């Protein structure tokens, strides 16, 4: 369960929800579940422009990361184009789906819970110790950072959940 309330009324604060935004790209031949890099790029660009946060301040991103041959490269491409072009430090990326699978309508809440718990414990991924072959070509020119063993606390977090 996630309880959202005003900070002044909270007994304990685990995380703050600064801004939210969503979009939909279901008007295409392949259907709503087929990912589209351009639509994801637009969502990320609009999000950071509207909430007035520089993507360079982002330390960690909890991605949708379904582990599919089509979805992961599309999502990584959008993340790279919007969040990584001017970075001087690596952007750490994670996904809960490598531990629990895709929980369909609850996947966004699972991602939020994972990151909040990670701020305290940072549990390693159960299955993903190497980058899957479907994204190796895309990441060939990138530094790959395995965050499974990184236990540092991060302050700037972002969740992406697109369908």
Regions found by a protein language model. Give the residues of each.
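Condensing-enzyme catalytic core of the thiolase-fold
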Residues: 1-163
